[in-house]
Amino acid sequence: MTPTNQSSGTTNASVEVLSEDGPMPINVMMQEGVKALTKILSNQLQDRQAFQNAPHAMQFVIRNGGKALSNARLEELKDALPKMDSLSLEDELAKIDGQSAYHIDSAEEKETFESKIGQIASRNSADFIIEEDLQNILDDDLKDSELNLDGEEAEIIFDYESQELDTPDGIGEKISQMIESVLPGGFGSEEQGGLRTVTNVEDLDVAEEVTDIDHDTVDAARLHGDGKHSISSRKHSRSKNSKKNGHVRRHDFYDESRDHKSCCPHHHYENLSKLRNYYYHDFEYISKTENRVPDFSVLVNESSPMCLFCEYYMVFGEPPRNMIKWYNRTFGYNRMPNPPRDEQDSRKRNR
């Protein structure tokens, strides 16, 4: 890519994508051209702060088989069409590509083509055919609806010269609009992925890789969804079993396999007989201590992890009664493991 400085101070640049292996689908050529143009616009324009100076512009051209006309070529035809008869118009349109790929063969097709030209010219009452009408003629009457580049050396040329680009953020949108304007049906939905819609420069850079990523993303999302469904099913099943057994567990999301025994004294089963009833968390810890000055150094010196209640107990020297009551009111008593059967019988006998 070699920029060319014009006398007016504007800078022109173009990218050519050549097909060395014969005819190629238009979308493949589009993708390669878009990727190349994106690199130019992002690296060249932004690096030299072009958008802080005079506005730049951009043009999209397809040659050797393209159905759409470049902006410059369209302007030429606007001036030339009113001066042509139908035969010279057909010849001029055939020059869009070097192979004369577009032809109006039958007399009926020629008559239809001429009538459309006459209707548009009289309706506009001007010396040229407007761009939308000309493009409609090309779409309706020219052949090769698949829009394949079928020359020996097909090429797509990107040139930012005719449309102003105000900010870097508008690059992707402009490219998307221009490419969509030259495709017969806009951006089609392809089963195999590929170039669909482009909204910004970052999307352009990864347009070709989307096909490879889509399958992995879908598979990962499916696995994630299946995992969530499996967890939800297990929770639902566990909740049904709990209700069937007469227990309503409001916090099945807690890890019940977590070992509370080594955490603090009130988690030990052997001390349950010294407490007044099963809901021992609403009452005092086993050993009573006198109030003392809080000692936060114990948290630094303690190597084993402690629960929030135990941290309070170690620092302040007294059980966090209000914290425990709030916890039990919020999460319920049934989360705590049931004591062994012999401990329950022992407590009943001691009453």
Curated annotation (Swiss-Prot):
Q: Where in the cell is it found?
A: Cytoplasm, Cytoskeleton, Spindle pole
Phosphothreonine carried by residues: 211
Q: Where is the composition biased (Polar residues)?
A: 1-14
State the residue spans of region: Disordered. 1-20, 222-249
User: Which GO BP terms, alphabetically?
Assistant: cell division; mitotic spindle assembly checkpoint signaling
Instruction: Enumerate composition-biased segments (Basic residues).
Output: 231-249
Q: What InterPro entries is this protein classified in?
A: IBD2
User: What UniProt keywords apply to this chain's record, in alphabetical order?
Assistant: Cell cycle, Cell division, Cytoplasm, Cytoskeleton, Mitosis, Phosphoprotein
Which residues are reported to carry the modification Phosphoserine? 100, 106
Gene Ontology cellular component list: cytoplasm; spindle pole
Q: What does this protein do?
A: Part of a checkpoint which monitors spindle integrity and prevents premature exit from mitosis. This cell-cycle arrest depends upon inhibition of the G-protein TEM1 by the BFA1/BUB2 complex.
Q: Assembly and interactions?
A: Interacts with BFA1.
Indicate the family of this protein. Belongs to the IBD2 family.
Q: Protein name, please?
A: Protein IBD2
Cite the source lineage: Eukaryota, Fungi, Dikarya, Ascomycota, Saccharomycotina
- Originating gene: IBD2
